[in-house]
Amino acid sequence: MSDVVTLRVAIEAHGEPVSELTLRRPTVQEVRAIKALPYKIDKSEEVSLDMDVAAKYIAVCAGIPPSSVNQLDLADLNALSWAVASFFS
């Protein structure tokens, strides 16, 4: 399973301009290596994103370097983070 996300603002990855990213599901090995979920559930059962962790998953699942994740527009970061979180439900 994978999700294609069209970016509002293009970034550069591997020396090339990128206007869409394909996110694949993380493997169990990758989840264990990151050691955290991309979201948190509080006492009232509200879900919120953990953006630092989500950024790690975006890099891994999209196959781009962390420096490219840092170039993302905030709206794109939010959309990609929720897409990553959806892999865990």
Positions of the model-derived regions?
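Short, surface-exposed, charged amphipathic helix/loop patches that serve as local interaction elements
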Residues: 2-89
